[in-house]
Amino acid sequence: MESTPKKAPRSKFPALLVVALALVALVFVIWRVDSAPSTNDAYASADTIDVVPEVSGRIVELAVTDNQAVKQGDLLFRIDPRPYEANLAKAEASLAALDKQIMLTQRSVDAQQFGADSVNATVEKARAAAKQASDTLRRTEPLLREGFVSAEEVDRARTAQRAAEADLNAVLLQAQSAASAVSGVDALVAQRAAVEADIALTKLHLEMATVRAPFDGRVISLKTSVGQFASAMRPIFTLIDTRHWYVIANFRETDLKNIRSGTPATIRLMSDSGKTFEGKVDSIGYGVLPDDGGLVLGGLPKVSRSINWVRVAQRFPVKIMVDKPDPEMFRIGASAVANLEPQ
């Protein structure tokens, strides 16, 4: 009987090599994920402002369309300036009339001031006369008892003293009248300052009727047209600040230990995943709303009981500034993938 030949034992080296390579690859992937975190839970974003008119009026010119790119200083829209132009003309006319009134009043005041100076001199003269009459009466009255003067002479002295006092009072009233006339110009000058303030405010309102782009951006959410009445402080549309784009990437809290402000990043947008953009970490979020607890009632946190032994890492937003964004690709809310390279 012929004996069957024994099969040669298979070598285990290739299988061991494959297992070893798989382990090495697994270790590399784990190290890479831990040292260079990546996430596809990210989106592009930019700062926005609501474009609001600061004055009310009907829109007479709308220089932009929805989703249009604009440059700083470009005209966005114009509100009917005619009411503000009329207010400005009215205020300027009031100022001109007030200037004429001040000029005429000043002439009158100058004349009254000259008269007031004359009255002041008359006051001093009347005061001296009244003093002299009082002194004469004071000297004459004792002489009547001695018989050196007659009663008639004393009466004349009293009459002279009373007349001098009356003259003095009349002159004092004239002086007060002249002083009040001078103060009337001060009131007109103050009124002129108020009119000038009205003119400045009206010019500002007229300037505000023309709204221009405060920075390079893109118009969105435009839902109005010429003829619409615009109310002050009510948004007309939104303007995206396209000068600075950034990506909000939500990383697991276990990935945050090596992430710092300035950490280099590589960004890809899903609209064109073959193109990459460089960036740097700007900041890391310090607060998110938890999904399953933390409700505060009466000052004490209410924590729900849990029998779930699997803990899912919380994600925190990381803001990544993009160095040279493509203005045609970046849109607010665009899906992105972020890869970080901690140093």
From Swiss-Prot:
Pfam families: CusB_dom_1, HlyD_D23. Residues 1-12 are cytoplasmic. One of its GO terms (molecular function) is xenobiotic transmembrane transporter activity. InterPro entries: CusB-like_dom_1, CusB_D23, MFP_Efflux_Pump, MFP_proteobact. It comes from the Bacteria. The chain crosses the membrane at residues 13-33. Keywords: Antibiotic resistance, Cell inner membrane, Cell membrane, Membrane, Signal-anchor, Transmembrane, Transmembrane helix, Transport. One of its GO terms (biological process) is response to antibiotic. Its main location: membrane. Belongs to the membrane fusion protein (MFP) (TC 8.A.1) family. Could be involved in resistance to puromycin, acriflavine and tetraphenylarsonium chloride. Could be part of a tripartite efflux system composed of MdtN, MdtO and MdtP. This is Multidrug resistance protein MdtN.
